[in-house]
Structure formats: structure tokens, C-alpha cells
Amino acid sequence: MTDKNDRAGVPASGARARRSPSRQPLARSAERARADAIFLGRLRRHHDELRWLYMELYDNADMFGELVDQLRRFYDERPAALRALDERRERAGAWYRERGQLGMQMYIDNFAGTIAGVEGRLDYLERCGVTYVHLMPFLDTPTDRSRSDGGYAVSDFRRVKPGLGTMEDLARLAERCHERGISLCMDFVMNHTSDEHEWARRARAGEGEYMSRYFFESRQDVIDRYTRDVPQVFPTTAPGHFTYLPELGQHVMTQFYPYQWDLNYRNPRVFNEMMYNFLFLANQGIDVMRLDAVPYIWKQLGTNCRNLPQVHTIVRMMRMISEVVCPGVVLLGEVVMAPVEVVPYFGTVEKPECHMLYNVTTMATTWSTVACRDTRLLRSQLEAVCALPRAYTFLNYLRCHDDIGWGLDYATLSGWGMEEVPHKRYLNDYFQGLVPGSTSRGELYNADPVTGDARFCATTASMCGVEAAALAGDGAAMDVALRKDVMLHAYLLAQSGLPIIYSGDELAQVNDYSYRDDPERADDSRYVHRGRFDWSLVGRADDPGSAQGRIFGALEELEGIRRDEAVFDADASVEIVNYSDPAILWIRRSAGGRTLEAVFNFSDDEKNLWMPARARFTDLVSGDEGEFETFSLPAWDFRWYLRA
């Protein structure tokens, strides 16, 4: 017979206690004490500043107290494996800055059907050398795809979209990824919700508590002031800033699409609840949170509602909250703004905000350089990046899920005789293949017939000419297109920061025009580069004579060199050489007494180039060694020369 105290873990007799001592309660107690000490130490480090900023913004001590209580709850609920990972990353420092990091961005359904399907494809991702996977939006959205904005109209922040899987699937995928040294990134859409979100449905029903979480307005003069002062996000496809709701007789703010209601971060309940969503997702094993449209989150009448000081207050609080509960998690800011407006989102070295930012301007400037065969603006952009503190880390990319907006430095370009409107028109014509000599293919997005402004959509391979060469059956043109594609990836890998490849680019996948046959997608040309991953191409990756084999093999080799060579360290010294020929981009990286001369030819002509001095160099790609002062560089080619 078992004593009731024994069932509770209390020995029934001294003899039994001596025979079978229970150490588990003591172990649990010690583990709990250690966890308490870790949490309280982190909270003490940030509490005063966090409270100061919160009270400055909201002046609500009760809501701040609730927030702190919830931080403890989410910390307690954080799985032990993730807590251990947090501690390892705290000891290691900025893990995302390691030179061996390589990202890949993908849509779950296009790549593998479901989250479980992605788990089944991890061997392929490892083969690609991927250490960071950005899963495009997978949270629940309206079933009508024309109202989902590709996943950016979230209906439920704690539910995976049916058909893709479950939160349990996500947590399991994160666990399997961590076993392989792969981190997971997701989009945290914090500016707005879908109009089908519970908050929006209750607001539409007239519940004041939920109406206060959005911006409702009935005064036409106020709406007119917003229209006057705030730039439109989609002036042609979704003009205006408000959507009228006849059942309420009011307008609700919708800066993006009418079905995406802007959240009111003036309400502390909105901030708190969104932070709880953030921490819930972090506790599923997400390593990197991409803060979508973060510059837009604070609205103030009489301003342009972009990049306001309160935005930085919120991001700084998010950084501290994550460092208390889940310090292994990285904040990645999506700031599609002019360079002068991007850098402040790093915060300061003493009071950091985002860990990483998208290098949007450099991406757009790179493609402008391809079209113009002139690297001067790109040099200027890279020099500005090099002048920043080395702790500031950019996520570098050639293409992503989104369109390319030509947000270039037109103040500089106009000084060189390139005016904004005709230059943008030239770029869009060039990449559509409408300019003589262009082999690019793609489509315009959100074209404005009045101003002539538009954004551009295509895959990397199609922009480099792979699609056009394949359709023409032109082997010589294909050689040039593939050389250009490889050169651009070599340039990507030569930059400091975390390089990320869009899924399919490693196999030179071209545009997919089938979206035109889908009524729910036909009006959104961004789907031209959001096609399904073509698994039939993977079999050609081992064929060095195929386009896929040439790209895959080249990227595999370049990524391996980057992993092994210390000159690619994030803390290496980087200089942009002002070479006399504007078609040449020259990046010099130095570390540990070794120097890399990374040289790129953005032109259709072979170039004869001069080193700074005669010396002995090793070509890191071919392995050739020799002493020389001059060298030739074919059109759209590159060299990685190492000098010891």
C-alpha cells in the first residue's frame, strides 16, 4: 500500500528515505534558482531604461507592471533548449555576424508545400550551405488570397495558416534546424492586422476597447490633413489612407491596403499585446524577427507618419524586452527608406535598436549599376556603409520576395546629369528588355501612368539574361548571363554582413508567368518571381555543363571560400578603391596581415587593370598563384586576389 505522502514525493519512513533518497526536488530547486537569477539579472540590467521609456510614451504604471509580469511568464515558458541556446549566444556574442552565415529566403508552399515539408528538405538546405532560413509569412490570413497581401495581412498571430501546418510543426522545424546549426527567420507584421483579425471584427461591431486599437476617424478635415501630409504607399493600386466603413459611419486608417488596418501604438494595450505575440513566436524557436514596415508604426497628425522618434522608442523597448526574455533572438529591421533614414534604426552602440537592417539602397543601386555600367554611385553607397561602426550589420541581397523600388541617391545622380524621372524610366525599360543591348526580362509593379514611376519584378537569373538566352537558344549569350549572375553573387559575398539568397537563385530559376492565369494573383506582378521552386532543376546541379550546375557549383565554391578565409570576417577592414575606370568596382578587405583585392567588371568589355603595386597574389577561385602588377578581366567577370 502506498502512503498519500509518498505519492506527493514525501518518504513514508526514515528507512525508505535512506534506501531511496529523492534528489529531484533539490535539483529542480537549484535549476529554478539559477533561472530566477538569470532572469532577474537581465531585468535589472534593463528595467530602469525600459520603465523610463514606457512611462514617457504611455504614462501608465499599471500597464508597465503587467508587461513585466508577462515577461517573467514568457521566460518561464521558454523551452529549456531555447534558454540554453540563448546563453550560448550571449557568450558567443553576435552570432549572426559570423562569416560562415548564409541565408535563404523562401515561401513555404512554393518550396516544400508545408512546414513539415521544409523539415523534409533540410538535407538540401545543408547542401546549399544555408545556415539561416527566412520563412515568408505563414501566419493565418484571410482565405481569399486577394485579401492576404501575400501573408502580410495577419488574422491571428498565434495560428499558422491552415494548409501550411501548425505551431507544433513550426516548433519541431525550429528544433530540427537548431540541431543542424540553422536559424529561422519570420516576418513580424506589426504595423497592421487583417480586417478579419479578432480585434478588427470586434472593432467593426462597435466595441470601443477594440476600436481604440486602430485609428477611426469621422472628421473629413482630419482625413484631408493626412492625405496632404502623408505619402501614399500604393498610390495606384490602393490610393488614400482611410477606408470607409458604412456600418459604423466612420473611416479606419489603412495605409497599405483597405483590408489592412493600421494599429494604434499610442494605446499601451496594443504595444503590450503585440509584444506578447512577439514573445510567443520567439518561444516557438524563431531566431530572427523581421520587423515589417517598422518606420510606419507611429502616426501623428501634422507629420508624414514615417520614422518618428516614437518608432525608435518602441524598437528600443523591443530590443530590451528580447534581451530579457530571449536574448538569442535577433531583430531585423525592414526599413525601405533613404540611407539617412535607415541607419538610425541601429540605435547607438550604447543603446542599440535593431541587430540587423536590410541593405535596401545598396541592392537597388547594384541593379542600377548593371543597367548603367557605371559604379560611381555604388562606390559612394558602399563607402557610406564602410564608414559606419562595424557592429552595425546589414543583411545583403540581390533579390527578395518584393519588387525593386528605385530609391536611389538622386541628389548625387543629378549632379552627373541623371535626372530622377528619365533615369527611373530608363531602368524600368532596361530591365524589361526594351533597351537595345538589354537581355533582362521582367515586369513592372505599381506603375503610375501620370508620373511614369514604377517598381520592378523579376528573378536574379532573368535580370541577368538567363531567361532570354534560354529562349533564344543562344549559347554565347547564356555564357555572358551566367557570368554576370556569378559575378553579382561574388560581389554580394564580398560585402560585410549576412548574405541571403532568394530560393531558386542558386539554380538560376527564371520568371514564372503562370500567376497571370490565377484571378487572385493576376493583378500582382510580384508573383512573377514568387513561382514554385522547381525541384526538377536540383538534379542538374551536379551537371557542370548545365546552367544550374554552373551557378550552383560556383556559389558552392564561393561560399566555401568565404567561410574559410579570415579576410571575410565582419570586423575586417574594408576599403572601396576609387579606380579610374567607372565600370570597375574594387573592394579591398584586410584582416590578420592578409589583403583581398575583390574586383568586379560591370561592363560588356574586357578590361586591362593595374594593381596598386607589383606583388604575389593567389586567385582564391582558380588557385593560381603568381607575381604581377597588371591583369585582364573579362566582361561581367570578377577576381578574388589574395595577397599575404
Question: What does each model-found stretch correspond to?
Answer:
Residues T2-A644:
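Active-site and adjacent substrate-binding regions of carbohydrate-active enzymes
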